[in-house]
Amino acid sequence: MRAIVATVLLAVCLGAAVLAGAQAPTLAPNELGRVMILEYHKIDNPEARWTRTPENFKRDLTRLWERGYRTVALTDYLDGKISLPAGTSPVILTFDDSSPGQFRYLQKGADWVIDPACGVGILEAFAREHPGFGHAATFYVLPGAKAPNDLFNQADLAGRKLQYLASQGYEIGNHTLWHAELARYPEATVRDQLATAQAWVQRHVPGYRFRTVALPHGSYPKELGWAVSGEAKGMTYKHDAILMVAGGAAPSPHAKNFDPLHLPRIQVVDKDFDYWLTYFDRNPGERYVSDGDPTTVTVASGTTGKVGAVKAARVIERR
């Protein structure tokens, strides 16, 4: 039985979160608040329904930084292990479809270098310039898709890219073999799509196991269990979370209503992204804010009844 400790916590200050003189907001901890899981597709020109320009992607990161958001790994969120400085908030970046602008190499003499205008290049440069922001992200790849979505559209470099992502702390997720809408297919096809996608990635990154799947077009199979775990052609798969294509901000992993098999996301188009940034600006009490201590879960007064199963040693009620 967890101990619920009532205490008074002082408001915390984000002293290190300063960008060009802009001070991040000072927020009291609330680890039952909601979390934005952002969904990107193409990073390219021009801006369109499923395309974010490199300039707008940089602007997105800046707006998040200025508001005290910091990137966290999706699996850390799932495990309830969000370790951030007090007063900051987690944001989760996801990229669907392994399109070229997400991760591109350029040849420089005899070497290959990451294109500074691609998603990975932009994110890593921003993280270097803003210590503490991080570069955590999950890439939902399509190993068997046709060009240009066949593992970022540089066939000879596909293995190098996947190995780089895995070695640098990024996560690789299942998006089926070639973007199959799973509701349309029988069990055998669903399982083959999910297992074979993992097998293809393991050709380049031996032993790599997907922990999450993002459903193409948010299309669930006829039976939920088919997407959770199974086997095909000798390859087993097991997903701890299923990500939807839309739905808004996600619950805290510590909340009773946390459902990892139905995780909503926010599509990053101006309308949706602006809405949620503004929503949490106006309703800061609904936003997940870290207490700075990964061994505790701090919640607002009167909300301990909304806490679900937590792995932390203590739940602290802020008065």
Per-region residue spans from a language model:
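Alpha-helical scaffolding within the catalytic cores
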Residues: 24-26, 77-83, 121-127, 149-167, ...
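Alpha-helical scaffold elements lining the catalytic groove of polysaccharide deacetylases
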Residues: 112, 151-171, 177-205, 225
